[in-house]
Protein backbone atom coordinates (compact mmCIF):
# COMPACT_ATOMS: atom_id res chain seq x y z
CA UNK A 1 0.00 0.00 0.00
CA UNK A 2 2.92 2.33 0.61
CA UNK A 3 4.15 2.10 -3.00
CA UNK A 4 2.56 4.42 -5.57
CA UNK A 5 1.14 2.60 -8.63
CA UNK A 6 3.71 4.17 -10.96
CA UNK A 7 6.54 2.91 -8.73
CA UNK A 8 5.39 -0.69 -8.24
CA UNK A 9 7.33 -2.05 -11.22
CA UNK A 10 10.63 -0.65 -9.96
CA UNK A 11 9.86 -1.73 -6.39
CA UNK A 12 9.17 -5.26 -7.61
CA UNK A 13 12.50 -5.47 -9.46
CA UNK A 14 14.45 -4.13 -6.49
CA UNK A 15 12.70 -6.47 -4.04
CA UNK A 16 13.35 -9.55 -6.17
CA UNK A 17 16.97 -8.52 -6.68
CA UNK A 18 17.47 -8.22 -2.92
CA UNK A 19 17.01 -11.96 -2.50
CA UNK A 20 19.64 -12.78 -5.11
CA UNK A 21 22.11 -12.17 -2.28
CA UNK A 22 22.28 -14.95 0.30
CA UNK A 23 20.49 -13.86 3.46
CA UNK A 24 22.10 -14.08 6.89
CA UNK A 25 21.33 -17.22 8.86
CA UNK A 26 20.40 -15.24 11.97
CA UNK A 27 16.99 -16.68 12.81
CA UNK A 28 15.19 -13.63 11.40
CA UNK A 29 12.80 -14.44 8.57
CA UNK A 30 12.69 -12.04 5.63
CA UNK A 31 9.13 -11.73 4.35
CA UNK A 32 8.17 -10.02 1.10
CA UNK A 33 4.73 -8.40 1.15
CA UNK A 34 3.15 -8.54 -2.29
CA UNK A 35 -0.04 -7.01 -3.65
CA UNK A 36 -3.46 -8.65 -3.53
CA UNK A 37 -3.75 -11.77 -5.68
CA UNK A 38 -6.97 -10.38 -7.13
CA UNK A 39 -5.21 -7.32 -8.58
CA UNK A 40 -2.96 -7.01 -11.63
CA UNK A 41 -0.11 -5.80 -9.44
CA UNK A 42 -0.38 -8.95 -7.35
CA UNK A 43 -0.39 -11.20 -10.42
CA UNK A 44 2.70 -9.39 -11.68
CA UNK A 45 4.35 -9.90 -8.29
CA UNK A 46 3.66 -13.64 -8.37
CA UNK A 47 4.93 -13.91 -11.95
CA UNK A 48 8.19 -12.24 -10.96
CA UNK A 49 8.59 -14.59 -8.00
CA UNK A 50 7.91 -17.64 -10.16
CA UNK A 51 10.50 -16.48 -12.69
CA UNK A 52 13.33 -15.98 -10.20
CA UNK A 53 15.70 -18.72 -9.08
CA UNK A 54 16.11 -17.08 -5.66
CA UNK A 55 12.60 -16.50 -4.30
CA UNK A 56 11.99 -14.88 -0.90
CA UNK A 57 11.81 -17.35 1.99
CA UNK A 58 8.31 -16.11 2.77
CA UNK A 59 5.51 -14.06 1.23
CA UNK A 60 2.92 -11.91 2.96
CA UNK A 61 -0.41 -11.95 1.13
CA UNK A 62 -2.86 -9.08 1.82
CA UNK A 63 -6.65 -8.95 1.54
CA UNK A 64 -7.12 -12.71 1.23
CA UNK A 65 -10.81 -13.51 0.84
CA UNK A 66 -10.84 -17.23 0.10
CA UNK A 67 -8.81 -20.40 0.39
CA UNK A 68 -8.88 -20.78 -3.40
CA UNK A 69 -6.45 -17.87 -3.76
CA UNK A 70 -3.90 -19.58 -1.55
CA UNK A 71 -4.41 -23.05 -3.01
CA UNK A 72 -3.65 -21.67 -6.48
CA UNK A 73 -0.57 -19.80 -5.27
CA UNK A 74 0.63 -22.92 -3.45
CA UNK A 75 0.27 -24.96 -6.65
CA UNK A 76 2.21 -22.43 -8.71
CA UNK A 77 5.03 -22.26 -6.17
CA UNK A 78 5.16 -26.04 -5.94
CA UNK A 79 5.38 -26.35 -9.73
CA UNK A 80 8.47 -24.12 -9.64
CA UNK A 81 9.84 -25.95 -6.58
CA UNK A 82 9.89 -22.72 -4.60
CA UNK A 83 9.77 -23.29 -0.83
CA UNK A 84 8.23 -19.94 0.09
CA UNK A 85 6.30 -19.88 3.36
CA UNK A 86 3.08 -17.87 3.46
CA UNK A 87 1.79 -15.24 5.88
CA UNK A 88 -1.86 -14.36 5.32
CA UNK A 89 -3.51 -11.04 6.15
CA UNK A 90 -7.21 -11.25 7.02
CA UNK A 91 -8.68 -7.77 6.67
CA UNK A 92 -12.04 -8.13 4.92
CA UNK A 93 -15.47 -9.43 5.92
CA UNK A 94 -15.19 -12.22 3.34
CA UNK A 95 -11.78 -13.23 4.63
CA UNK A 96 -12.94 -13.22 8.23
CA UNK A 97 -15.92 -15.41 7.38
CA UNK A 98 -13.61 -17.93 5.70
CA UNK A 99 -10.66 -17.59 8.07
CA UNK A 100 -10.86 -21.23 9.21
CA UNK A 101 -10.75 -22.57 5.65
CA UNK A 102 -7.95 -20.18 4.71
CA UNK A 103 -5.82 -21.11 7.72
CA UNK A 104 -6.12 -24.82 6.95
CA UNK A 105 -5.81 -24.78 3.15
CA UNK A 106 -2.01 -24.98 2.77
CA UNK A 107 0.91 -26.44 4.69
CA UNK A 108 2.94 -23.41 3.62
CA UNK A 109 1.02 -21.06 5.91
CA UNK A 110 2.91 -19.99 9.03
CA UNK A 111 0.65 -17.23 10.33
CA UNK A 112 -2.60 -15.30 10.03
CA UNK A 113 -2.25 -11.55 10.42
CA UNK A 114 -5.16 -9.42 11.59
CA UNK A 115 -5.57 -6.36 9.35
CA UNK A 116 -7.48 -4.20 11.79
CA UNK A 117 -7.35 -0.93 9.86
CA UNK A 118 -9.06 -2.22 6.72
CA UNK A 119 -11.35 -4.41 8.79
CA UNK A 120 -12.62 -1.48 10.84
CA UNK A 121 -13.29 0.43 7.62
CA UNK A 122 -15.33 -2.46 6.25
CA UNK A 123 -17.25 -2.85 9.49
CA UNK A 124 -17.76 0.92 9.78
CA UNK A 125 -16.51 0.76 13.36
CA UNK A 126 -13.76 2.47 15.33
CA UNK A 127 -10.28 0.98 15.08
CA UNK A 128 -10.26 0.22 18.80
CA UNK A 129 -10.04 -2.91 20.92
CA UNK A 130 -13.70 -3.41 21.88
CA UNK A 131 -15.31 -2.99 18.42
CA UNK A 132 -12.76 -5.37 16.87
CA UNK A 133 -12.72 -7.98 19.64
CA UNK A 134 -14.99 -10.39 17.76
CA UNK A 135 -12.88 -10.17 14.59
CA UNK A 136 -9.68 -10.68 16.57
CA UNK A 137 -11.16 -13.73 18.27
CA UNK A 138 -12.08 -15.27 14.91
CA UNK A 139 -8.48 -14.88 13.73
CA UNK A 140 -7.13 -16.53 16.88
CA UNK A 141 -9.59 -19.42 16.62
CA UNK A 142 -8.76 -20.04 12.95
CA UNK A 143 -5.00 -19.88 13.51
CA UNK A 144 -5.20 -22.15 16.54
CA UNK A 145 -7.18 -24.75 14.60
CA UNK A 146 -4.39 -24.92 12.03
CA UNK A 147 -1.56 -24.84 14.57
CA UNK A 148 -0.11 -21.62 13.17
CA UNK A 149 0.69 -18.20 14.62
CA UNK A 150 -1.82 -15.37 14.97
CA UNK A 151 -0.30 -11.90 14.66
CA UNK A 152 -2.19 -8.80 15.79
CA UNK A 153 -2.43 -5.55 13.83
CA UNK A 154 0.36 -2.97 14.38
CA UNK A 155 -0.22 -0.11 16.80
CA UNK A 156 -0.15 3.05 14.70
CA UNK A 157 0.66 5.73 17.31
CA UNK A 158 4.45 5.87 17.55
CA UNK A 159 4.24 8.41 20.38
CA UNK A 160 2.24 6.13 22.69
CA UNK A 161 4.51 3.18 23.60
CA UNK A 162 2.53 2.45 26.77
CA UNK A 163 -0.71 2.28 24.78
CA UNK A 164 0.93 -0.18 22.41
CA UNK A 165 2.23 -2.28 25.30
CA UNK A 166 -1.20 -2.50 26.91
CA UNK A 167 -2.82 -3.48 23.61
CA UNK A 168 -0.11 -6.10 23.06
CA UNK A 169 -0.77 -7.54 26.53
CA UNK A 170 -4.48 -7.82 25.66
CA UNK A 171 -3.65 -9.47 22.34
CA UNK A 172 -1.39 -11.98 24.06
CA UNK A 173 -4.12 -12.75 26.58
CA UNK A 174 -6.56 -13.36 23.73
CA UNK A 175 -4.22 -15.88 22.13
CA UNK A 176 -2.14 -13.90 19.65
CA UNK A 177 1.47 -15.04 19.41
CA UNK A 178 2.80 -11.69 18.24
CA UNK A 179 1.96 -8.19 17.08
CA UNK A 180 3.05 -6.33 13.97
CA UNK A 181 5.15 -3.18 14.17
CA UNK A 182 5.53 -0.14 11.92
CA UNK A 183 8.83 1.12 13.35
CA UNK A 184 11.95 -0.55 14.82
CA UNK A 185 11.53 1.32 18.10
CA UNK A 186 8.35 -0.66 18.78
CA UNK A 187 10.10 -4.03 18.57
CA UNK A 188 11.78 -4.14 22.03
CA UNK A 189 8.45 -3.54 23.77
CA UNK A 190 6.69 -6.20 21.70
CA UNK A 191 9.51 -8.67 22.35
CA UNK A 192 9.17 -7.97 26.06
CA UNK A 193 5.44 -8.75 25.98
CA UNK A 194 5.48 -11.84 23.78
CA UNK A 195 8.73 -13.48 24.94
CA UNK A 196 8.01 -16.19 27.53
CA UNK A 197 9.31 -15.17 30.95
CA UNK A 198 11.70 -17.42 32.87
CA UNK A 199 8.86 -18.28 35.24
CA UNK A 200 6.62 -19.35 32.34
CA UNK A 201 9.44 -21.39 30.78
CA UNK A 202 10.19 -23.23 34.03
CA UNK A 203 6.49 -23.98 34.52
CA UNK A 204 6.27 -25.37 30.97
CA UNK A 205 9.31 -27.57 31.62
CA UNK A 206 7.79 -28.85 34.85
CA UNK A 207 4.44 -29.66 33.24
CA UNK A 208 5.93 -31.44 30.22
CA UNK A 209 8.38 -33.37 32.37
CA UNK A 210 5.65 -34.45 34.80
CA UNK A 211 3.38 -35.64 31.99
CA UNK A 212 6.19 -37.56 30.31
CA UNK A 213 6.98 -39.38 33.55
CA UNK A 214 3.34 -39.99 34.52
CA UNK A 215 2.18 -41.34 31.15
CA UNK A 216 -1.41 -40.39 31.94
CA UNK A 217 -4.06 -37.95 30.75
CA UNK A 218 -3.86 -35.60 33.72
CA UNK A 219 -1.55 -34.68 36.57
CA UNK A 220 -1.66 -32.48 39.65
CA UNK A 221 1.03 -29.79 39.85
CA UNK A 222 1.22 -27.40 42.79
CA UNK A 223 -2.30 -28.42 43.78
CA UNK A 224 -3.76 -27.67 40.33
CA UNK A 225 -5.23 -30.23 37.96
CA UNK A 226 -3.49 -30.07 34.57
CA UNK A 227 -4.96 -32.02 31.66
CA UNK A 228 -3.14 -33.32 28.60
CA UNK A 229 -4.51 -30.74 26.08
CA UNK A 230 -2.42 -28.12 27.91
CA UNK A 231 0.74 -29.91 26.73
CA UNK A 232 0.55 -28.46 23.21
CA UNK A 233 0.85 -24.92 24.52
CA UNK A 234 3.64 -25.89 26.91
CA UNK A 235 5.67 -27.42 24.08
CA UNK A 236 5.02 -24.31 21.97
CA UNK A 237 6.37 -22.09 24.76
CA UNK A 238 9.50 -24.22 25.04
CA UNK A 239 10.00 -24.16 21.26
CA UNK A 240 9.76 -20.36 21.21
CA UNK A 241 12.20 -20.06 24.11
CA UNK A 242 14.65 -22.44 22.43
CA UNK A 243 14.57 -20.51 19.15
CA UNK A 244 15.12 -17.20 20.95
CA UNK A 245 18.07 -18.63 22.87
CA UNK A 246 19.59 -20.27 19.80
CA UNK A 247 19.49 -17.15 17.66
CA UNK A 248 20.03 -14.60 20.43
CA UNK A 249 16.98 -12.67 19.23
CA UNK A 250 16.43 -10.63 22.40
Where in this protein do the model-derived segments appear?
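Expand to "…catalyze enediolate/carbanion chemistry for C-C bond making/breaking, isomerization
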Residues: 1-250
